[in-house]
């Protein structure tokens, strides 16, 4: 099955002009009858299918680069240094008609083009907790569009208006999914300290860092650290994450940040925005692999020039 909406766009972490640093957006339209609480009820099959689409895209992308067919013409989802994956925006779209109860002055409006998130429309599928950049961590969101606006837009057959709407809604998908991630995770940048072997530190601590680190650009000298956020625990509860899990993971995250301080300049927490900014730091180190010092089997001995206790 072909999904209804799939396109290549800006990654959720950082903007880029290079195709290899973009990501895939995967969307499917669900124009079902709405419930009394004005929500579209999705079946389990629809949800699992949407996760399967994302997994298939990830594996297809992996095969391109494993087979040597990437050639910079496709997004490269996996970062080879950290083995983290660029998060894939995955979403449903449903149609709504502005009503008197929830739309106020926009009742039956043909001009309301706002993309709205459905209440309780966020779902999270994962194999491990607190690993945003793991390939099996898949976020799924659900949005509404004004059915009357869409009918009006395509009924007029105005190509420029349709192109403007497409550009607007694609940016909105990115902004809104970024907003959801900001509720779930705390983001920090890591820049290597001068004189420290940061590459080896990542290798030695791979188990602790797996799924938490990502290098958004292949030649960048910084990493992104994403850790589960404790403050907005209500959204975690809506995702059926136990409070004991939140406490355990956030406690381990604090220990991890302390450990990273020995080799990296760790920034203050920041939120994902349209543009990405990084602090300017003097005398930063490098993330490249350092040559190992050669160890030779040398035996060193001492011979006294004189020995006061020795007599002929």
Report each predicted region and the residues it spans.
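Short, low-complexity, charge-dense intrinsically disordered segments
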Residues: 307-312
């Amino acid at each position: 099955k072909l999904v209804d909406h799939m396109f290549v766009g800006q990654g959720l972490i950082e903007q880029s002009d290079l195709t290899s640093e973009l990501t895939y957006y995967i969307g499917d339209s669900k124009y079902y009858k709405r419930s009394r609480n004005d929500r579209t009820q999705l079946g389990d099959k629809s949800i699992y299918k949407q996760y399967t689409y994302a997994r298939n895209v990830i594996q297809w992308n992996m095969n391109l680069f494993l087979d040597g067919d990437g050639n910079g013409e496709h997004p490269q989802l996996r970062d080879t240094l950290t083995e983290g994956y660029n998060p894939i925006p995955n979403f449903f779209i449903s149609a709504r008609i502005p009503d008197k109860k929830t739309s106020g002055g926009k009742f039956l409006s043909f001009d309301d083009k706002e993309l709205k998130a459905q209440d309780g429309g966020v779902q999270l599928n994962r194999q491990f907790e607190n690993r945003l950049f793991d390939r099996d961590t898949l976020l799924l969101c659900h949005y509404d569009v004004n059915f009357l606006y869409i009918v009006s837009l395509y009924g007029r057959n105005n190509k420029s208006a349709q192109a403007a709407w497409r550009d607007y809604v694609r940016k909105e998908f990115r902004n809104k999914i970024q907003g959801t991630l900001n509720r779930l995770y705390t983001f920090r940048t890591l820049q290597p300290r001068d004189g420290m072997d940061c590459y080896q530190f990542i290798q030695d601590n791979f188990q602790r860092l797996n799924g938490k680190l990502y290098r958004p650009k292949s030649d960048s000298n910084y990493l992104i650290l994403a850790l589960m956020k404790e403050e907005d625990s209500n959204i975690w509860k809506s995702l059926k994450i136990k409070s004991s899990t939140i406490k355990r993971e956030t406690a381990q995250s604090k220990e991890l940040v302390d450990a990273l301080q020995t080799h990296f300049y760790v920034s203050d927490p920041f939120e994902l925005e349209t543009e990405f900014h990084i602090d300017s730091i003097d005398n930063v180190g490098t993330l490249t692999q350092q040559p190992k010092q050669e160890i030779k089997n040398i035996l060193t001995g001492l011979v006294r020039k004189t020995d006061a206790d020795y007599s002929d």
